[in-house]
Amino acid sequence: MATNQEAGRHQEVGHKSLLQSDALYQYILETSVYPREPESMKELRELTAQHPWNIMTTSADEGQFLNMLLKLINAKNTMEIGVYTGYSLLATALALPDDGKILAMDINKENYELGLPVIQKAGVAHKIDFKEGPALPVLDQMIEDGKYHGSFDFIFVDADKDNYLNYHKRLIDLVKVGGIIGYDNTLWNGSVVAPPDAPLRKYVRYYRDFVLELNKALAADPRIEICMLPVGDGITLCRRLS
């Protein structure tokens, strides 16, 4: 019989891995992710697993990937749209220098406050500027101000899929040339290759066309170069060229 810990991990496998083999994904987690996961991220991951909406969280392997990516590009000024309890936010904050900054936006502050004590205990809360509410009005104001153009090293989007294209139209001006925008869930439970009559969950079917539209638009955007990776539920990295 599986232990509660094993059951929780396999639940993560079912929701967040696109690998055909659960055993292979479990091997990745057990071999290279969990043993190197910072204690604060482990604590927040386990706390989030008890939340009824835990399917919304970033997977542990994707958190590890984001943390390393931010270190590789020496990111200092970042943005995150869609925070939930803050697992990916914590991965980002831990990767930034002490004077690094994250503009974090989410419509639900209550979820963020669930993970905030862990973030505070990790000593990185001072890097985060959290704003509650829709992100689009904030982005529009930043663009209108003018001083934020090309100011962000990295932007991570894990929010309302039906607005991803609207985000992209604005974020391309806010990320610096050579900077990266990461869009999460771009393989959307694998539904991007599902036949029209496939039995999909209602929310998966609803957002599927928005994800497909985004993927098509990103592939055709000459202002960026892209790389779509099967990490977590799929993440597309967009490096701004001009």
Swiss-Prot record:
It holds the Pfam family Methyltransf_3. One of its GO terms (biological process) is methylation. Disulfide bonds: none annotated. Substrate binds at residues 16, 158, 189. A divalent metal cation binds at residues 158, 184-185. Its EC number is 2.1.1.104. One of its GO terms (molecular function) is caffeoyl-CoA O-methyltransferase activity. SUPFAM superfamilies: S-adenosyl-L-methionine-dependent methyltransferases. Its cofactor is a divalent metal cation. S-adenosyl-L-methionine binds at residues 58, 80, 82-83, 88, 106, 135, 160. It comes from the Eukaryota. Binds 1 divalent metal cation per subunit. Keywords: Lignin biosynthesis, Metal-binding, Methyltransferase, S-adenosyl-L-methionine, Transferase. Pathway: Aromatic compound metabolism; phenylpropanoid biosynthesis. It catalyses: (E)-caffeoyl-CoA + S-adenosyl-L-methionine = (E)-feruloyl-CoA + S-adenosyl-L-homocysteine + H(+). PANTHER family: CAFFEOYL-COA O-METHYLTRANSFERASE 1 (PTHR10509:SF81), O-METHYLTRANSFERASE-RELATED (PTHR10509). Belongs to the class I-like SAM-binding methyltransferase superfamily. Cation-dependent O-methyltransferase family. CCoAMT subfamily. Methylates caffeoyl-CoA to feruloyl-CoA and 5-hydroxyferuloyl-CoA to sinapoyl-CoA. Plays a role in the synthesis of feruloylated polysaccharides. Involved in the reinforcement of the plant cell wall. Also involved in the responding to wounding or pathogen challenge by the increased formation of cell wall-bound ferulic acid polymers. This is Caffeoyl-CoA O-methyltransferase. The lineage of its organism: Eukaryota, Viridiplantae, Streptophyta, Embryophyta, Tracheophyta.
